[in-house]
From Swiss-Prot:
Species, as recorded: Salmonella paratyphi A (strain ATCC 9150 / SARB42)
Domain notes: In MsbA the ATP-binding domain (NBD) and the transmembrane domain (TMD) are fused.
UniProt KW keywords: ATP-binding, Cell inner membrane, Cell membrane, Lipid transport, Membrane, Nucleotide-binding, Translocase, Transmembrane, Transmembrane helix, Transport
Membrane topology recorded in Swiss-Prot or TrEMBL: Multi-pass membrane protein
EC class name: translocase
Record PROSITE patterns: ABC_TM1F, ABC_TRANSPORTER_1, ABC_TRANSPORTER_2, MSBA
Membrane-crossing segments per the record: 16-36, 64-84, 153-173, 253-273, 275-295
PANTHER family membership: ATP-BINDING CASSETTE SUB-FAMILY B MEMBER 10, MITOCHONDRIAL, ATP-DEPENDENT PERMEASE MDL1, MITOCHONDRIAL
Pfam families named in the record: ABC_membrane, ABC_tran
Lineage: Bacteria, Pseudomonadati, Pseudomonadota, Gammaproteobacteria, Enterobacterales
Gene it is expressed from: msbA
GO CC field: plasma membrane
Keyword match Signal: no
Protein name per its UniProtKB record: ATP-dependent lipid A-core flippase
Disulfides per UniProt: none
Binding site for ATP: 376-383
Length: 582
């Protein structure tokens, strides 16, 4: 079992390496800097021999005259290499995290709806934000610890003497200076931390909008828009992180330089006869070693494996998502605009993970330009039929045709470009009203076209009352708008899209009577010259449909016009009687 685990960890790291490899130049520079850093410590320790043997053993003061300059030079070199190694490793880490996030984000946008049905939004957000950050632990944190501590283990032990009493008055003099440096850096840290927290919120919000509005992204072809939006905030997050690293990395060399000046003062003071007579070689050795210990922060090797394993575990969860199969897009047929003829032939469909079919042997024709309404009790399969038209799910048996061709013959982009969707659960993005109406295609439509769509959707009356009109930011998922206003923006979006096929999935079910009247007028405008599939619980909204289809337990049980179905005294008549009390 142990060997299997080791093999799994190694395989995971090998798979992660291609993500790190493009930034290996940063690793090489960091490695060289770490080696020079360790070499400076080793050379510093080697100075103890001439110090003890010549400087004190033979009272050759010339050694103590040139050694301060060497020490200062070594400390400057150490500070520079420490900064370079920390910055380069963190640069690689930031690039790796950003690359993983972009891969995850792009992969998730290509996942089928069934994937999101089985996953919670919080879990997926955690994968994009937290787990991808954990990858840095394996690609940078553990790496820098192992290399640095492996190359300079003696330096780590010496750091235990950082607060040694032997530093005596020198540390007392240094304390206020170090305190000021720490206070200045701490303020910088707080400022950057706030910016990082705000930016992380933007990253999470961007990802959450894509995840919650996945269907809208697919229908309106908004993958590129969402990718650009996510890339922007993700890169902003990376830059904030680099500012934090820069401030952190430069603070250590400053403190180290202060300590090196103190060391130089100790050595210079020791060259005076009055001072030399009161010191022993052992005392100088302790002070010297303690000052060296100040040059490097204490790094612990005890938690490296745990840190590395956390990173590998995060990699495995991310790779599990990246290994998930995306939507099958094997069709080749591309069209500009469909006529709008739809037909279901012996369609049977079962949701993934379930055994009982949601639809059984569905046969349905919707001629171009006609309106067909689906009615039935909750859970009867009405919305499932609509989801199959857009290929959010693929059927088990039968065929669904558009203009005489199976839907699977079309590319997904071409197919979904023919369909506009208005549902009861409208998803709006944290953007302007205009950009929401022209979602994913803002460059294709003029301002006049957007305004005309809003006017036809009876939305301009409330838009004109907003502070910035069409340029008003409406908040996350349109939180600043009422239900009716959100519905009208969705209708304006569908009008502007001008697709030949329209799906209305209980578009007015959650509205009050006044809002429903305004929206119904907009829907009537929207349905003109389009093939429409309406799903409704309120039977009053579908009485004028060309055909009403009654679905019960995944089977079509009745079909006909409103008057014909009432005359049959069947399921539709019962539903009508229940609603209107007749």
């Amino acid at each position: 079992m142990h060997n299997d685990k080791d093999l799994s960890t190694w395989q995971t790291f090998r798979r992660l390496w291609p993500t790190i490899a493009p930034f290996k130049a940063g690793l090489i520079v960091a490695g060289i800097a770490l080696i020079l850093n360790a070499a400076s410590d080793t050379f510093m320790l080697s100075l103890l021999k001439p110090l003890l043997d010549d400087g004190f053993g033979k009272t050759d003061r010339s050694v103590l005259l040139w050694m301060p300059l060497v020490v200062i030079g070594l400390m400057i070199l150490r500070g520079i290499t420490s900064y370079i190694s920390s910055y380069c490793i963190s640069w690689v880490s930031g690039k790796v995290v950003m690359t993983m996030r972009r891969r995850l984000f792009g992969h998730m946008m290509g996942m089928p709806v069934a994937f999101f049905d089985k996953q919670s939004t919080g879990t997926l957000l955690s994968r994009i934000t937290y787990d991808s950050e954990q990858v840095a632990s394996s690609s940078s944190g553990a790496l820098i610890t192992v290399v640095r501590e492996g190359a300079s283990i003696i330096g780590l032990f010496i750091m235990m003497f950082y607060y040694s009493w032997q530093l005596s008055i020198i540390l007392v003099v240094l304390a206020p200076i170090v305190s000021i440096a720490i206070r200045v850096v701490s303020k910088r840290f707080r400022s950057i931390s706030k910016n990082m927290q705000n930016t992380m919120g933007q990253v999470t919000t961007s990802a959450e909008q894509m995840l919650k509005g996945h269907k809208e992204v697919l229908i309106f072809g908004g993958q590129e828009v969402e990718t650009k939006r996510f890339d922007k905030v993700s890169n902003k997050m990376r830059l904030q992180g680099m500012k934090m690293v820069s401030a952190s990395s430069i603070s250590d060399p400053i403190i180290q330089l202060i300590a090196s000046l103190a060391l130089a003062f100790v050595l210079y003071a020791a060259s005076f006869p009055s001072v030399m007579d009161s010191l022993t070689a052992g005392t100088i050795t302790v002070v010297f070693s303690s000052m060296i210990a100040l040059m490097r922060p204490l790094k612990s090797l005890t938690n490296v494996n745990a840190q590395f394993q956390r990173g590998m575990a995060a990699c495995q969860t991310l790779f599990a998502i990246l290994d998930s199969e995306q939507e099958k897009d094997e069709g080749k047929r591309v069209i500009d605009r469909a006529t709008g003829d739809l037909e279901f032939r012996n369609v049977t469909f079962t949701y993934p993970g379930r055994e009982v079919p949601a639809l059984r042997n569905i046969n349905l024709k919707i001629p171009a330009g006609k309106t067909v309404a689906l009615v039935g009790r909750s859970g009867s399969g009405k919305s499932t039929i609509a989801s199959l038209i857009t290929r959010f799910y693929d059927i088990d048996e039968g065929h669904i045709l558009m203009d005489g061709h199976d839907l699977r013959e079309y590319t997904l982009a071409s197919l979904r470009n023919q369909v506009a969707l208005v549902s009861q659960n409208v998803h709006l993005f944290n953007d302007t009203v205009a950009n929401n109406i022209a979602y994913a295609r803002t460059e294709e439509y003029s301002r006049e076209q957007i305004e005309e769509a809003a006017r036809m959707a009876y939305a301009m009356d409330f838009i004109n009352k907003m502070d910035n009109g069409l340029d008003t930011i409406i908040g996350e998922n349109g939180v600043l708008l009422s239900g009716g206003q959100r519905q009208r923006i969705a209708i304006a979006r569908a009008l502007l899209r001008d697709s030949p096929i329209l799906i209305l999935d209980e578009a007015t079910s959650a509205l009050d009577t006044e809002s429903e009247r305004a929206i119904q007028a907009a829907l009537d405008e929207l349905q003109k010259n389009r093939t429409s599939l309406m799903i409704a619980h309120r039977l009053s909204t579908i009485e004028q449909a060309d055909e009403i289809v009654v679905v019960e337990d995944g089977i079509i049980v009745e079909r006909g016009t409103h008057s014909e179905l009432l005359a049959q005294h069947g399921v539709y008549a019962q539903l009508h009687k229940m609603q209107f009390g007749q």
